């Protein structure tokens, strides 16, 4: 053992990386990692926003097919699909016609009832009820007018069969009914009946103040 020669290790002759290169490599790795993180951050929000929009969107209503109109097919009978489709179309058309008919029947009920206005029909030789609501008298005959049963008339007009407005005076209106003169005081309603009949004249009411009546008298 004492005679064994000592083996001397030779010094290492390998390449050693300088310190500044290590710093450069570290900076490159950090830069690549930072760019990769930014790239991933730009791409990843797209599916997240899409999923969030899908979650926030209201669910779409899907029309439910009634069991009575469902179309079924039998594997052993290929023609059953066509027959079932025809039955479904027939039932759908029948239900649509019933719905439209029911809506048409319900429509007249929703309309308000119209008030009966204008001239009523009287017996032959008699006049119906006349509501005298307005009387306009001026010195110009073409500007004189009266409102009977909600309609405006002038001298010479015939508001009812056989009745003619002959002249509009300041406090009365002169009519002719079937050729007979007939006088009605201003704003005096006619209760109906035959002109000149004492019963009809006795049923006349006293003039009452009406908010809608307008009486205008002008003189030059």
From Swiss-Prot:
Family from the record: Belongs to the ExeB/OutB/PulB family.
UniProt protein name: General secretion pathway protein B
Compositionally biased intervals (Polar residues): 202-220
Example of a GO biological process term: protein processing
NCBIfam families: T2SS_GspB (NF037978)
Sorted UniProt keywords: Cell inner membrane, Cell membrane, Membrane, Transmembrane, Transmembrane helix, Transport
Cellular component terms (Gene Ontology): plasma membrane; type II protein secretion system complex
Compartmental location: Cell inner membrane
Biased composition (Low complexity): 85-107
Membrane topology: Single-pass membrane protein
Disordered: annotated segments: 85-114, 188-220
Functional summary from the UniProt entry: Out proteins are required for the translocation of pectate lyases and cellulases across the outer membrane.
Principal location class: membrane
């Amino acid at each position: 053992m004492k005679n064994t020669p000592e083996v001397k290790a030779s010094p290492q002759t390998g390449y050693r990386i300088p310190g500044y290169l290590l710093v450069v490599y570290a900076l490159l790795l950090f830069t690549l990692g930072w760019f990769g993180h930014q790239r991933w951050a730009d791409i990843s929000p797209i599916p997240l926003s899409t999923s969030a929009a899908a979650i926030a969107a209201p669910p779409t209503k899907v029309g439910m097919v009634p069991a009575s109109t469902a179309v079924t097919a039998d594997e052993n009978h290929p023609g059953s699909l066509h027959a079932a489709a025809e039955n479904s179309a027939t039932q759908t058309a029948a239900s649509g016609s019933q719905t439209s008919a029911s809506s048409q029947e319900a429509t007249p009920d929703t309309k308000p009832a119209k008030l009966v206005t204008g001239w009523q029909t009287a017996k032959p030789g008699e006049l119906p009820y006349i509501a005298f609501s307005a009387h306009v008298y001026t010195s110009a005959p073409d500007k004189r007018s009266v409102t009977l049963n909600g309609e405006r008339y002038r001298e010479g007009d015939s508001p009812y069969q056989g009745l003619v407005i002959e002249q509009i005076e300041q406090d009365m209106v002169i009519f002719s009914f079937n050729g007979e003169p007939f006088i009605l005081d201003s704003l005096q309603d006619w209760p109906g009946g035959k002109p000149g009949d004492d019963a009809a004249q006795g049923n006349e009411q006293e003039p009452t103040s009406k908010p809608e009546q307008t009486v205008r008298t002008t003189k030059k």
